[in-house]
Regions:
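Membrane-interfacial helix-loop-helix
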Residues: 19-79, 84-90, 118-119, 140-154
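FAD-site-proximal beta/loop scaffold in flavoenzymes
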Residues: 313-328, 416-496, 578, 582, ...
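Flexible, glycine-rich terminal cap/loop adjacent to redox cofactors
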Residues: 171-173, 185-197, 202, 209, ...
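A conserved FAD-binding loop/helix module that cradles the flavin
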Residues: 369-376, 466-526, 603-625
């Protein structure tokens, strides 16, 4: 109709008529919705509508203008929806007319040019071609304009400094903050890195590095117990726990120079120790001094979550942050949580001599993995004497002269466990307190992480967030991955912005057996109705695994039906975290199983399992008709 109006009445008359007619029609639909539906919806869903109404009363006009300017949703749905929300009809009318006016002008212009056609040759005239080009680019122009307006709106309440001390301020010196700072310094930007604790963050000081050092000591102790399997005399294993923990600290101290103030200062980063608070989109206060920067990156990480359970606060509980301070192994260790952290540390302490009880409210350990994967790890735990309780919720902790106990309940059952120390491994919470985010209007997600867009921007367009504080994946390698996008978008986003690539995200749980995965699991594929075919290779048949007495586990790959394109892969077994990387590379660069099969793998290595899996995939799809003719040919050739 808009095109027809332009063709019949010319540009200005049509623009006037169509603009008013569409706005009046939209307002009439709005009023019908308000009269017939608003009271019923507000009464029925009042509990849920409170926050929506409050937000719309504050920013409703801008939301409506955005929906009108960038016509993503059908206008008739917008008319009905807006009638349910707290906006006055007059405001609805003029905001709608203003928001629809640019698109109306573009379409009326196209109709005007079409109406002036005198012959087919006029189709390639400059005015008509220009109108078609304008129609094509308008959605992109509208989105750019909307983004520009949102940015100006977010910054309008603050006074922008005339000059900046820094190009970039990074808050947090964990994996994300270190990488973001390094990138900025590498491209010769002036960057200040603020850290309130130790350089290197959780990964170096309380996470990845110390836990893997502890796991290694525990594995060696387990190997000593298995001496007879390797033809050695049986060994009596005596674990000197204080020396084990001293070794863990030596490992941390050896790695620490990689993340030190001295190294990063030498690379061009200004390192500051202290608590950071963001005062404005360009100002950060630290140690009583206000620093300015054109852009800010929040990389403040996360901390162990402490559940609110009666009696817990009165105990000297352990977390993944504090467990490295102990020098006496608990005789009875209770571990709450059976995710990666809980499973890794539970098994390590069991191998170092503690009697471990692992308790989780989930129906199985490692709930993010397929059941058969979790079962392999569970079987190993049970063989090593661990107690595992799934589906139980802790309801109360008690402590008296007889010791410490925890009461757990499940459907129709109640248990009480005695313990000496309890380790909390029930997840992690983003460090967002005392940064000044609420005052700036920077929101959080339901998971409690900083809300960011696909470019890692917060609600303030020059403040970015990356790593554990932003989620959605709390992995060190993901923090480093996000940091590149945050730093580059902050420094060069005015020229080109990059969306974070989450298409191929690998991770590993360093239990024994190890579990490593990338892409879809079989459970996720089923839940999301993704068509797939599954291929499996059991590692107990692999020569190198047999030679190493580590012949257990499997490799499983999901592929598109009828194709060798990999949708996901999981490896369970010895050095699974190393083996998965071939599939990570393949998925990232579109390499299928046929090319993995055609690649020479060194013999004897564990990585041959990946090639053998590709062989199993190929074998299941062998061309039976061609092989039948080949058999006849060979029979004929024998005479």
């Amino acid at each position: 109709m808009t095109l027809a109006g332009g063709a019949l009445f010319g540009f200005w008359y049509a623009l006037l008529l169509v603009s008013f007619a569409s706005s009046i029609g939209a307002t009439l639909a709005f009023l019908v919705s308000r009269v017939l539906l608003r009271d019923w919806v507000q009464e029925r869903f009042g509990r849920h509508m409170g926050a929506v109404n409050a937000g719309f009363e504050r920013d409703g006009s801008f939301y409506l203008f955005s929906l009108r300017l960038v016509p993503i949703f059908p206008f008739f749905l917008i008319n009905l929806l807006m009638g349910l929300l707290p906006i006055r009809p007059w405001r609805y009318y003029w905001v709608s007319q203003l928001g629809m006016l640019p698109a109306t002008a573009v379409y009326v212009n196209a109709g005007t040019q079409l109406g002036q056609l005198q012959s087919l040759s006029g189709i390639i005239s400059a005015p008509l071609l220009g109108s078609f080009v304008l129609l094509a680019v308008f959605p992109f122009m509208a989105r750019w304009l909307l983004g520009y307006m949102q940015g100006r709106r977010a910054l309008a309440a603050y006074d922008r400094p005339q000059r900046f001390d820094n190009n970039l301020i990074v808050i947090g010196a964990g994996s994300a903050g270190l990488v973001a700072s390094l990138i900025a310094a590498t491209v010769k930007a002036k960057v200040t890195l603020i850290e309130r604790g130790k350089m290197g963050g959780d990964c170096l000081n309380t996470g990845c590095v110390p836990s893997k050092a502890l796991i290694r000591s525990a594995r060696v102790a387990q190997y000593a117990r298995r001496a007879g399997e390797f033809g050695l005399a049986p060994m009596s294993v005596e674990v000197n726990f204080p020396r084990v923990m001293e070794r863990v600290q030596r490992v941390v101290e050896t790695v620490a120079p990689h993340d030190s103030v001295e190294r990063f200062t030498g690379l061009g980063v200004n390192c500051v120790q202290g608590d950071a608070r963001i005062l404005s989109p360009w100002e950060v206060e630290v140690n009583g001094e206000v620093l300015t920067a054109r852009n800010i990156v929040i990389a403040s990480g996360a901390r162990p979550r402490v559940p609110d359970i009666p009696g817990l606060a009165q105990l000297d509980y352990l977390t993944s942050d504090t467990i490295w301070d102990i020098r006496e192994a608990p005789q009875r260790l209770l571990v709450l949580g059976a995710g990666p952290i809980g499973c890794e540390l539970a098994q390590a302490f069991a191998r170092l001599g503690s009697h471990v009880s692992l308790v989780t409210h989930a129906s199985r350990i490692m709930p993010r993995e397929d059941p058969e994967v979790a079962q392999q790890v569970l079987d190993a735990f049970l063989r090593q004497g661990m107690d595992v309780h799934t589906g139980y919720d802790p309801v109360r902790f008690t402590a008296d002269e007889e010791g410490q106990r925890c009461v757990f309940t499940t459907a129709g059952d109640r248990r009480e466990l005695a313990f000496d120390r309890v380790l909390l491994a029930v997840g992690r919470s983003a460090n967002v307190q005392e940064l000044g985010l609420e005052a700036l209007g920077i929101g959080l997600t339901r998971a409690g992480t900083v809300a960011v867009d696909e470019y890692l921007r917060t609600a303030i367009p020059n403040i970015f967030a990356c790593g554990d504080v932003a989620g959605p994946y709390m992995f060190t390698h993901m923090a480093s991955h996000q940091a590149w996008y945050a730093a580059v978008n902050a420094l060069f986003g005015r020229f080109r912005k990059f969306k974070v690539d989450y298409s191929v995200v690998p991770w590993a749980t360093f239990t024994d057996p190890e579990v490593a995965r990338v892409g879809l699991s079989e459970s996720e594929a089923r839940d999301n109705n993704v068509a797939y075919e599954v291929t499996r290779y059991d590692i107990d048949d692999l020569d190198r695994a047999i030679a190493d007495s580590e012949a257990h586990g499997f490799v499983k790959v999901l592929t598109e039906p009828g194709r060798d394109r990999i949708l996901g892969a999981v490896v369970v077994g010895y050095h699974a975290a190393e083996l998965i990387n071939e599939f990570v590379l393949a998925m990232k660069h579109g390499i299928g199983l046929n090319k993995i099969l055609a690649t020479i793998h060194i013999y004897p290595t564990l990585s041959e399992s990946n090639k053998f899996l590709a062989g199993e995939w190929r074998k299941a799809r062998k061309p039976e008709r061609v092989l039948s003719w080949a058999e006849r040919y060979h029979r004929w050739n024998r005479g």
